[in-house]
Amino acid sequence: MPAIVLIGAQWGDEGKGKATDLLGGRLQWVVRYQGGNNAGHTVVLPNGDKFALHLIPSGILTPGVTNVIGNGVVVDPGVLLTELAGLDQRGVDTSRLLLSADAHLIMPYHVAIDKVTERFLGAKKIGTTGRGIGPCYQDKLARVGVRVQDVLDEKILTQKVEAALEFKNQVLVKIYNRKALDPQQVVDEVLEQADGFKHRIADTRLQLNEALERGETVLLEGSQGTLLDVDHGTYPYVTSSNPTSGGAAVGSGIGPTKITTVLGILKAYTTRVGSGPFPTELFDQNGEYLAKTGGEVGVTTGRARRTGWFDAVIARYATRVNGITDYFLTKLDVLSSLDTIPICVGYDVDGVRHDEMPMSQTDVHHAKPIYEEMPGWWEDISHARTFEELPKNAQNYVLRLEELSGAYISCIGVGPGRDETIVRRDVVR
């Protein structure tokens, strides 16, 4: 049976949680393969209950699904325990959550350094969430990180923390004029937190591969989006991991030949949180309309999202970079009540037309959108359950996005609820 990768095709916040939730009843496993609690998924159940998840996979809300925090994720122990407690309080069964022994832990010193670094950079800041994600990945690549399995051996944990703080305390005290952290206090805090999740630690790469061999279906759930990928995104305004499909194999331990479907999630317009280039960004009443109607506030940060028209250049780019086979188009309903809807089909960069993503960072910053306009619609589309039930102009808009993006739009979101979805083609195949 298949391994399906779910990818954000823009700058994150595309509605990946809704897609996971929709597929949940047909999945046996849902896996987070990268990132940390610097991104959020919102899921609205048929009864109206709304859940905001930051670290735990969205499949936790579907009974019978085993959820995995994979080796490519960086885990804040406190956030994990808080999120689990919140789900438990609301009656959600969290017993089927596993934690890769090889995932890295976000330590208190990662958070401290992240926050003071952003403040120090001031206007030149990248716009991180200040949750220690980047510093944790830095330690991982420098081979000095603390892994989940280290909480099972206090001696190893202590050695790693002492070695890390020998250098990081120098940075905190001498560069940023902050207090030094006590190694033993850090160790004690982490071990106390570990008591709440040690029973979940597992060899998840083995379990996932055995599940596929048994014919079970696995969904690999990315956080953030393609344009935030550290290699393929709008560098340096990116995250510290690989949300793209290549990261799914690395961050889960599933071989790439096991992946049968790459489902890209596209918002019917474009949003971005934080700093960085955004060619179709709107600063007028249209931008305000999209932000207000779409409820564009970051789940994790609470920051207002920047809004703009649909950008087909980055959609085509995402299709190629990820090998996307299908798209789930979300928030089409937000565009109702617009007379015309512009679509960015290319960029003007200093007088030269670009139909594909510019190679250089400078060109991306200089890019001005080239628009074509589509007629809008005024009908309420939230009750449409087949493509044919959409207004003709809405159908034409979807078909044009499909043509420009280069992959079939299999699902269309017409509202926030799980049932407010049109399925044109089954993505579980």
Curated annotation (Swiss-Prot):
Residues reported in the UniProt entry to bind IMP: D13, E14, G15, K16, N38, A39, G40, H41, T129, R143, Q224, T239, R303
Annotated positions binding Mg(2+): D13, G40
Ranges in a coiled coil: none
Pfam families: Adenylsucc_synt
Cystine connections: none
Active site residues of this protein: D13, H41
InterPro entries linked to this entry: Adenylosuccin_syn_GTP-bd, Adenylosuccin_syn_Lys_AS, Adenylosuccinate_synth_dom1, Adenylosuccinate_synth_dom2, Adenylosuccinate_synth_dom3, Adenylosuccinate_synthetase, P-loop_NTPase
Listed CDD domains: AdSS
Cofactor note: Binds 1 Mg(2+) ion per subunit.
Family as reported in the entry's similarity comment: Belongs to the adenylosuccinate synthetase family.
Record's protein name: Adenylosuccinate synthetase
